[in-house]
UniProtKB/Swiss-Prot annotation:
GO biological process terms, semicolon-separated: rRNA catabolic process; rRNA processing; tRNA processing
EC number: 2.7.7.56
Signal peptide limits: none
GO molecular function: 3'-5'-RNA exonuclease activity; tRNA binding; tRNA nucleotidyltransferase activity
Pfam families in the record: RNase_PH, RNase_PH_C
Protein name in UniProt: Ribonuclease PH
Origin: domain of life: Bacteria
InterPro entries on file: ExoRNase_PH_dom1 (IPR001247), ExoRNase_PH_dom2 (IPR015847), ExoRNase_PH_dom2_sf (IPR036345), PNPase/RNase_PH_dom_sf (IPR027408), Ribosomal_Su5_D2-typ_SF (IPR020568), RNase_PH (IPR050080), RNase_PH_bac-type (IPR002381), RNase_PH_CS (IPR018336)
Amino acid sequence: MRPAGRSNNQVRPVTLTRNYTKHAEGSVLVEFGDTKVLCTASIEEGVPRFLKGQGQGWITAEYGMLPRSTHTRNAREAAKGKQGGRTMEIQRLIARALRAAVDLKALGEFTITLDCDVLQADGGTRTASITGACMALADALQKLVENGKLKTNPMKGMVAAVSVGIVNGEAVCDLEYVEDSAAETDMNVVMTEDGRIIEVQGTAEGEPFTHEELLTLLALARGGIESIVATQKAALAN
């Protein structure tokens, strides 16, 4: 039996609290069970040098974990003087995922930075970050419209992510830490609200997985993401 008695295709309870901080144009506290991430969206006029004069915007992201978001304290990367490879990989993933949610030409020459700070980690921090950051991005873009900076909202649709894997020979959705650490296969899937795939990161930690198992995991991910997107849309409607 899974932790908390979840079925294999069931995601943890997902909570999205909008306007969690007062300064950022968009801010969301996202909770996937005991994993909690604060996601903020900040808008700046102008774009990176490589995009100047092209009439399009840019979306980038930064990711970090608070020192005691994990079971034992991890030193801040700022104190070490550099970011780790895992951090850089995750923040690039978040940025790629969210650029897929926006018409960058319609955004115009604005840069939006998504900051994802893990307050508490219990598996799936990158997938929670993508899900929460998409909400923060949606709120920030709406503010550009409300402030008269944009005529139309360039958001193409919601994006969400979930982890799937094979644990004790069974395919499961939205892994907690105890499952993730024991998984034979671990995969992160990012999709649009209509089920198109943005990114798949999959690794056989133990035995290699079959083509059939891959399809099973992708189907599990799609079902989980449909549930998460429904939660996103309900939160946006409030």
